[in-house]
Amino acid sequence: MSKILVISGHPNLPDSTANKTVLDAVKNHFGDAINMRELDKLYVNGKFDVPAEQKALAEADIVVLQFPVYWYSVPGLLKQWIDDVFEYGFAYGSQATALRGKKLLISATAGAPENMYRDALPYELTTTY
């Protein structure tokens, strides 16, 4: 079986509904076959344990980034993790091989009132001058 690494990028997972539900379903389905990394618990004293995070990535066959969409982007906590962990020489560069051949899955949640999910937006996003 493939080794699956799930990165939870929610900055406050205990107060989440959708993200917590997704992660609970993944845990129940895959059990011990996954390595679940909850970034809100791993970000201690303003930093990540970069070698430990890189080791988890290197050992995985499949990497899942699970997060809520905030302002059309990932939460700041996940952005910080990406910036810290995906270093030159590890994640990119001519000598970087740690992530080669791995599969990436993005699992993103978004929330808005029901009336926002329709064909036409409730307001114009662009203006012609």
List PLM regions with ranges.
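Short histidine/acidic/glycine/proline-rich micro-motifs that form metal-
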Residues: P11-P14, K41-V44, P122-Y123
